[in-house]
């Protein structure tokens, strides 16, 4: 009787309204999470739970059991999604959720549909000899980065909860196990389309495309060519998203086609990192040995991934193969222009320009070249430039960003000359710049310090402090000024790891 009551209470916490589970059986494998020994709730994202219309009181009480997979709420239809993918350029026809289980979907108070997924919830038919589990480090990393991206205003999956399992996981060393609860607009990837296309399953591609249009792009239902319009819309969202990554120095680290969503959200934060000193060739991921997914390569990789999506949609775009290729190629060519427009618009904002002039690109590129040559910190340089825009006395602090402070003089002269023709007042400009140039990002060394304290000592104090700081990245927080600072040489993170 007790377990039934608990299940009923848990069910009330999630007003599930599942749709993906209604797709044909070949789209997924039904899979119940595997129970764990002693779950403990590390963190519940209560504001997000409220936004999703969840019962926070129930989640506080039963969250450890629910978010570990020990207690499956009523209305859930747990499943592992099928997908394929190009990983570092090589195609794998079957990947799928090897350690993630989709519990179901909820519709928030604004009518938006979201997936609720457990990562590290045990093996699935797609586990490929893996244990289906996650270690606490990658779980905390994803929690931190997800919420930081949200606060920065960058479309990304969200963190609803993190729990420890009371069980070890075995990687290069024995680590505490954990489960992460992810919220996403959906978990449909470029690789999901590839899964069906690789099998010659055009009906599957069509069913998936129809589902994506209905869920993410309903305004395309009545388009003359809805599948071509879908391809164009996904391309537009990815161009805008990747431009936003570059604006904050974000390096995803593993831009495989199975890690690119069709919703336009950033997903899968395993080896991701934020750049310290500006260098377009920056790579952190330990598995990216040739720099395929380096900072500056991300726009081109986005285009490459979208070309793979286009290949899957060709039979739907036009029955005549040559016509389909021509139409898809036009979308791919347009991606480059779209990305450049989004990137330049954002960079204009970062240096305080409200209007547009032909020389703006050269002015931006000159600053970036100077930053690279002078070893300037990406985030701090732009934040100090924001201060300088409103207070000429801040020039000393800005110049200190460069190895040779006097080196910034010629660029500052060009910048000020350009500002003289811009319509904003100094105060307006400084305010606008502070809204796009964060003071706080998830500094890699700070993330690692928080993870290390949790793994080695079970201490989540640094984790909580980091979440507090990163919730307001564009605000001055005098009590946390140290979190703005770049790492000391001894603190630098040189490589990040996927964690799987």
UniProtKB/Swiss-Prot annotation:
Residues involved in Mg(2+) binding: 259, 268
EC number(s) given by UniProt: 2.7.7.-, 2.7.7.108
Domain of life, per lineage: Bacteria
Pfam families for the chain: SelO (PF02696)
Required cofactor names: Mg(2+); Mn(2+)
Active-site residues (renumbered): 258
Top enzyme class: transferase
Entry keywords, A to Z: ATP-binding, Magnesium, Manganese, Metal-binding, Nucleotide-binding, Nucleotidyltransferase, Transferase
Molecular function via GO: AMPylase activity; ATP binding; magnesium ion binding
Catalytic activity: L-seryl-[protein] + ATP = 3-O-(5'-adenylyl)-L-seryl-[protein] + diphosphate; L-threonyl-[protein] + ATP = 3-O-(5'-adenylyl)-L-threonyl-[protein] + diphosphate; L-tyrosyl-[protein] + ATP = O-(5'-adenylyl)-L-tyrosyl-[protein] + diphosphate; L-histidyl-[protein] + UTP = N(tele)-(5'-uridylyl)-L-histidyl-[protein] + diphosphate
InterPro entries per the UniProt record, alphabetical: SelO
Ligand binding (ATP): 96, 98-99, 119, 131-132, 182, 189, 268
Entry function: Nucleotidyltransferase involved in the post-translational modification of proteins. It can catalyze the addition of adenosine monophosphate (AMP) or uridine monophosphate (UMP) to a protein, resulting in modifications known as AMPylation and UMPylation.
Similarity remark: Belongs to the SELO family.
Protein name (Swiss-Prot/TrEMBL): Protein nucleotidyltransferase YdiU
Organism: Rhizobium leguminosarum bv. trifolii (strain WSM2304)
Encoding gene per record: ydiU
């Amino acid at each position: 009787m007790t377990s039934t009551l608990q299940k009923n209470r848990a069910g009330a916490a999630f007003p599930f309204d599942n749709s993906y589970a209604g797709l044909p059986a070949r789209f997924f494998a039904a899979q119940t999470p595997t129970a764990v020994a002693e779950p403990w709730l590390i963190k519940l994202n209560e504001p997000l739970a409220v936004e999703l219309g969840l019962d926070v009181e129930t989640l506080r009480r039963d969250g450890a059991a629910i978010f570990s997979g020990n207690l499956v709420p009523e209305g859930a239809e747990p499943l592992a999604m099928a997908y394929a993918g190009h990983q570092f350029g090589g195609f794998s026809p079957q990947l799928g959720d090897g350690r993630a289980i989709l519990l179901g979907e909820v519709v928030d108070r604004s009518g938006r549909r979201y997936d609720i997924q457990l990562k590290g919830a045990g093996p699935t038919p797609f586990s490929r000899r893996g244990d289906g589990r996650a270690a606490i480090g990658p779980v905390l990393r994803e929690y931190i980065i997800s919420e930081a991206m949200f606060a920065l205003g960058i479309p990304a999956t969200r963190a609803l909860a993190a729990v420890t399992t009371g069980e070890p996981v075995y990687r290069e060393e024995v680590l505490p196990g954990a489960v992460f609860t992810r919220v996403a607009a959906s978990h449909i990837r470029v690789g999901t389309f590839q899964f069906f296309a690789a099998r010659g399953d055009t009906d599957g591609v069509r069913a998936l495309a129809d589902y994506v249009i209905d869920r993410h792009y309903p305004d395309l239902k009545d388009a003359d060519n809805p599948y071509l319009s879908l391809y164009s819309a996904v391309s537009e969202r990815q161009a805008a998203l990747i431009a936003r990554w570059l604006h904050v120095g974000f390096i995803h680290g593993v831009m495989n086609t199975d890690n690119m969503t069709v919703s336009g959200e950033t997903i899968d934060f395993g080896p991701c990192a934020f750049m310290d000193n500006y260098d377009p060739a920056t790579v952190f991921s330990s598995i990216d040995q040739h720099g395929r997914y380096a900072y500056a390569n991300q726009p081109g990789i986005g285009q490459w991934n979208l070309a793979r999506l286009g290949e899957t949609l060709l039979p739907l775009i036009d029955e005549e193969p040559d016509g389909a290729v021509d139409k898809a190629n036009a979308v791919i060519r347009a991606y480059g222009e779209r990305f450049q427009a989004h990137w330049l618009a954002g960079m204009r904002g970062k240096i305080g320009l409200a209007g547009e002039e032909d020389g703006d690109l050269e002015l931006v590129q000159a600053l970036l070249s100077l930053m690279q040559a002078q070893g300037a910190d990406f985030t701090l340089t732009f934040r100090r430039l924001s201060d300088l825009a409103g207070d000429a006395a801040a020039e000393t602090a800005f110049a200190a960003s460069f190895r040779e402070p006097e080196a910034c003089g010629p660029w500052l002269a060009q910048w000020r000359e350009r500002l003289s023709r811009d319509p904003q007042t100094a105060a307006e400009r400084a305010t606008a710049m502070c809204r796009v140039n964060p003071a706080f990002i998830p500094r890699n060394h700070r993330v690692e310090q928080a993870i290390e304290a949790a793994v080695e000592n079970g201490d989540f104090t640094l984790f909580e402090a980091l979440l507090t700081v990163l919730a307001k990245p564009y605000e001055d927080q005098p009590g946390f000024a140290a979190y703005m600072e770049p790492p000391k040489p001894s603190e630098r993170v040189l490589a990040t790891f996927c964690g799987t």
